[in-house]
Every structure is written in structure tokens, then in C-alpha cells.
Design a protein with these regions (language model features):
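Short, acidic/charged, Gly/Pro-enriched secondary-structure junctions
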Residues: 87-115
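Helix-start/capping segments and mature chain N-termini
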Residues: 1-79, 86-93, 117-161
């Protein structure tokens, strides 16, 4: 279902599932996958910025994102997930195949696939979806903030997080 005339989804040539490039409409996750049923997943949102002068796309802190992604999967006790070097290659292949020449957003996900209960740790699948997303207006115009005098509740009093 299209919601607007220039839907960014229309510019996606391929997505990546478990290292394989494929059209968006061919990428499927089972409704029985714990990643869907129990939110047994982790994700990273990664930005890449197009430089018109150099005709190049620049990824923002990719290595740091990948370390955080792997740490998140370890925290959830996922087993047998791909090395960050493999995921990095997959991201670069995805960007090359889509051939974006504008600012983009990359959504990297790792999730428990197939079938199982909440506590299963495998099989781990990954997906990479990249699509155009312009910089926020505040990037050029700036933003105003106020520093509050309120103190946050202690986590032991009433865990708000």
C-alpha cells in the first residue's frame, strides 16, 4: 500500500536476507519466528550521507554500529550469529546494488528465525534494508533545547526504562 507519491520504498532495488540479495517482495519471515512472535530481535539504524562534490556515499561510524549490534545479540544470548566482518560486507554489497546517490538510512536486524519459544537462541537470521532518508531539517536550521531542573527517578524506585 502506497501512502505517498514519492515513497522511499520505490527506490529499493534489493534487500539482504542472510547474506543474499533479493527483491523486497521476495524477503519473507515466518509468522512463527520468535523474532516476530516474541520480539526476539536486535537492530541498528545506520546513516549514510551522500557527498555531491565527491560523488560518494559515506557511512557514519559503521564499525561502532556493528560492535554494538554484535554486543546486543550476545546480550540476548543469540547463538551462531554472523561475524561483524561478514555483516559489513553484506551492507556494502547492499548499498552497491541499490546504487543510491542521496542520504540513506540502513536498518540492520538480527532475529531468531524459523520456529520456537521465547527462550530459543538459534537460528539467527539477519536482514538489511536501506532506503533514502533525507537529513532532518534541524541539520541546517539548528534546534533549541531547554535543560530541565527535574531529576530523573532512580531506577530502583520505579524502573521507568
Amino acid at each position: 500500500m502506497k501512502t505517498e507519491l514519492n515513497n522511499p520504498r520505490d527506490k529499493i532495488k534489493v534487500v539482504t536476507m542472510n547474506g543474499s540479495l533479493m527483491p523486497l517482495n521476495k524477503a519473507k519471515v515466518s509468522v512463527t519466528a520468535p523474532g516476530l512472535s516474541y520480539a526476539a530481535l536486535v537492530f541498528e539504524g545506520i546513516r549514510a550521507y551522500w557527498n555531491d562534490k565527491l560523488n560518494e556515499l559515506y557511512l557514519f561510524r559503521l564499525d561502532e554500529h556493528l560492535v554494538r549490534f554484535a554486543n546486543s545479540m550476545r546480550l540476548l544470548k543469540f547463538s551462531d550469529f554472523p561475524e561483524t566482518s561478514i555483516i559489513k560486507e553484506d551492507i556494502l554489497k547492499n548499498l552497491k546494488a541499490n546504487n543510491y546517490q542521496e542520504d540513506i538510512y540502513i536498518r540492520l536486524q538480527g532475529y531468531i528465525d524459523d520456529w520456537g519459544e521465547m527462550a530459543v537462541q538459534t537460528p539467527v537470521s539477519t536482514s538489511i534494508v536501506s532506503y533514502p532518508r533525507p537529513r532532518a531539517v534541524a541539520f541546517k536550521e539548528g534546534k533549541n533545547f531547554t535543560v530541565s531542573s527535574w531529576k530523573r527517578l532512580d531506577d530502583n524506585a520505579s524502573p521507568p526504562r
